[in-house]
Amino acid sequence: MKLVADVGNTNTVFGIWNRGKILKNWRISTGRLETEDEMYVVLKQLLEAGNVDLKSIEDICVASVVPRLNSIFHYFGRKYLELDPVLVTAIDGIGVKWDVDFPSEIGADRVANVIGAHEFYGKDAIVIDTGTAITVDVLKDGAFIGGAILPGPMMAMRALFSKTAKLPEVDLFYVENHIGKNTEDNIRIGVVNGTYYALKAIISKVKEELGDKIPVIATGGNSPMFNIGNGFFDILDSDLTLKGIAVFCERVRKLEKNSAG
């Protein structure tokens, strides 16, 4: 079994990958992973609750957008499991070409999403990941050709709250009418509805350039918030990032084995 981790700015999602499937997953606050020992305590509790023996973990695979935690995962792996984790990056030789200006700048989560989309849904896809930031990743003919980044709904709302004197934090959801009658709905319409239409416009423009038949795959914790009515997501795969991390890991280990002879 593999332990896979999608480390985000706000939350981290751990998963157990075995025989081509994510068997279990857990979402925790990234702030709980400040040292290798804290990571051990958290993971031991999660795995025990899921009836998974920590000693059954044979590999660790991590996609992190929080660079300072990369070393923590290495310390944890070596100290408690005698394993060196695989860190997801945009490298050559793993089945996807990186047709962008600076592949080294692609976030690990985006690499994992592209790998996962390519492995499970084919060589053409638009992937929408709705986390702290929202990413749009475009896969065409088996190559990552670019995308877009925009603020996620929580980030946008907290920017309003922190930069103004009177605007409150509110629960976020899509509002059916588009003329708010109170401050809370005004914020929801601006933040959630506004993001919905921004995504819809971006996807429409991408399809104009590449063709209408390219599927739109959604992942990330806020994806259901934007799949309103006849939504523009063709596929909702909450495990896409974890699956992509696991596939990346398997391909890297195969490359390492082949290079070792």
UniProtKB/Swiss-Prot annotation:
<comment type="subunit">
    <text>Homodimer.</text>
</comment>
<feature type="active site" description="Proton acceptor">
    <location>
        <position position="109"/>
    </location>
</feature>
<keyword id="KW-0173">Coenzyme A biosynthesis</keyword>
<dbReference type="GO" id="GO:0005737">
    <property type="term" value="C:cytoplasm"/>
</dbReference>
<keyword id="KW-0067">ATP-binding</keyword>
<keyword id="KW-0630">Potassium</keyword>
<dbReference type="GO" id="GO:0005524">
    <property type="term" value="F:ATP binding"/>
</dbReference>
<feature type="binding site">
    <location>
        <position position="183"/>
    </location>
    <ligand>
        <name>substrate</name>
    </ligand>
</feature>
<dbReference type="InterPro" id="IPR004619">
    <property type="entry name" value="Type_III_PanK"/>
</dbReference>
<feature type="binding site">
    <location>
        <position position="129"/>
    </location>
    <ligand>
        <name>K(+)</name>
    </ligand>
</feature>
<comment type="function">
    <text>Catalyzes the phosphorylation of pantothenate (Pan), the first step in CoA biosynthesis.</text>
</comment>
<dbReference type="InterPro" id="IPR043129">
    <property type="entry name" value="ATPase_NBD"/>
</dbReference>
<comment type="pathway">
    <text>Cofactor biosynthesis; coenzyme A biosynthesis; CoA from (R)-pantothenate: step 1/5.</text>
</comment>
<keyword id="KW-0418">Kinase</keyword>
<dbReference type="Pfam" id="PF03309">
    <property type="entry name" value="Pan_kinase"/>
</dbReference>
<feature type="binding site">
    <location>
        <position position="132"/>
    </location>
    <ligand>
        <name>ATP</name>
    </ligand>
</feature>
<feature type="binding site">
    <location>
        <begin position="6"/>
        <end position="13"/>
    </location>
    <ligand>
        <name>ATP</name>
    </ligand>
</feature>
<dbReference type="GO" id="GO:0015937">
    <property type="term" value="P:coenzyme A biosynthetic process"/>
</dbReference>
<keyword id="KW-0547">Nucleotide-binding</keyword>
<feature type="binding site">
    <location>
        <begin position="107"/>
        <end position="110"/>
    </location>
    <ligand>
        <name>substrate</name>
    </ligand>
</feature>
<keyword id="KW-0808">Transferase</keyword>
<dbReference type="GO" id="GO:0046872">
    <property type="term" value="F:metal ion binding"/>
</dbReference>
<keyword id="KW-0479">Metal-binding</keyword>
<comment type="similarity">
    <text>Belongs to the type III pantothenate kinase family.</text>
</comment>
<protein>
    <recommendedName>
        <fullName>Type III pantothenate kinase</fullName>
        <ecNumber>2.7.1.33</ecNumber>
    </recommendedName>
</protein>
<keyword id="KW-0963">Cytoplasm</keyword>
<dbReference type="GO" id="GO:0004594">
    <property type="term" value="F:pantothenate kinase activity"/>
</dbReference>
